[in-house]
Curated annotation (Swiss-Prot):
GO terms for biological process: peptide biosynthetic process. The keyword Kinase does not apply. It comes from Staphylococcus epidermidis (strain ATCC 35984 / DSM 28319 / BCRC 17069 / CCUG 31568 / BM 3577 / RP62A). The lineage of its organism: Bacteria, Bacillati, Bacillota, Bacilli, Bacillales. The keyword Cytoplasm applies. This is Elongation factor P.
Length: 185
């Protein structure tokens, strides 16, 4: 058990039959009445975000999340196969379970698979990935360097906005948290 007074961003807790990650919190001490903690929580199973208020000093159960380094192997129909780097055990996760992560997953990529009481609840990607551009309009000579962009499709099928100088075959460094272009690889 952990006191809500000890909340930190990124802490995982078990409340209301769900596993939640603390995204944001604020200790509030009104002039009248007792203090409380206002928090913003993300459900690790569904991805839903909820705001919840706790009384100051209230105790909640801390959820112990196990992180295992795994390697993404391949897609098998709608399922995706990962291999544990230590035990070489393989697990399959359905495609709808991965959501946005599919935009960045490529064969042999190392990821962190998160589980709670042996139930897989998420896949954490590296902060950046390098993906090759498979389709984009050619840059025209004389294009300005004033931040103009065009769309490009990378090897996973994900489409993003890139600067005009990016060409097919270029390798891009992409931020996995928001899907934005960082640089050429």
């Amino acid at each position: 058990m952990i006191s809500v007074n000890d909340f930190k961003t990124g802490l995982t807790i078990s409340v209301d039959n769900g596993i939640w990650k603390v995204i944001d919190f604020q200790h509030v001490k009104p002039g009248k009445g007792s203090a409380f903690v206002r928090s913003k929580l993300r459900n690790l199973r569904t991805g839903a975000i909820q705001e919840k208020t706790f009384r100051a000093g209230e105790k909640v159960e801390q959820a112990m999340i196990e992180n295992r380094r795994m390697q993404y192997l391949y897609a098998d129909g709608d399922n995706h196969v990962f291999m544990d780097n230590e035990t070489f055990d393989q697990i399959e996760l359905p495609g709808d379970y991965l959501k946005d992560e599919l935009n960045y997953l490529k064969a042999n990529m190392e990821v962190q698979v998160q589980s709670y009481e042996s139930e897989v609840i998420g896949v954490e990607l590296p902060k950046t990935v390098e993906l090759e551009v498979t389709e984009t309009e050619p840059g025209i000579k004389g294009d300005t360097a004033t931040g103009a962009t065009k769309s490009a499709t990378v090897e996973t099928g994900y489409t993003l906005n890139v600067p005009l100088f990016v060409n097919e075959g270029d390798t891009l460094v992409i931020n996995t948290s928001d899907g934005s272009y960082i640089s050429r690889g």
